[in-house]
Amino acid sequence: MKVVSSLKSLKKRDKDCQIVKRRGKIFVINKKNKRFKAKQG
């Protein structure tokens, strides 16, 4: 999982990426290709 300050560019890496908010943190997840994961912070 990558940790970045801005998730906008990482959301565009794949068309199935989606942004979710869990426990007060923002994540990019991808259910079809699990390697596209990122966390903001």
UniProtKB/Swiss-Prot annotation:
Protein name according to UniProt: Large ribosomal subunit protein bL36
Q: Could you tell me which species this protein originates from?
A: Rickettsia akari (strain Hartford)
Q: Name one GO molecular function term.
A: structural constituent of ribosome
Task: Tell me the Gene Ontology biological-process terms attached to this UniProt entry.
Answer: translation
Give the UniProt keywords, A-Z.
Ribonucleoprotein, Ribosomal protein
Checking PROSITE patterns in the record gives: RIBOSOMAL_L36
InterPro entries attached here?
Ribosomal_bL36 (IPR000473), Ribosomal_bL36_sp (IPR035977), Ribosomal_L36_bact (IPR047621)
Q: Name one GO cellular component term.
A: ribosome
Give the record's family classification. Answer: Belongs to the bacterial ribosomal protein bL36 family.
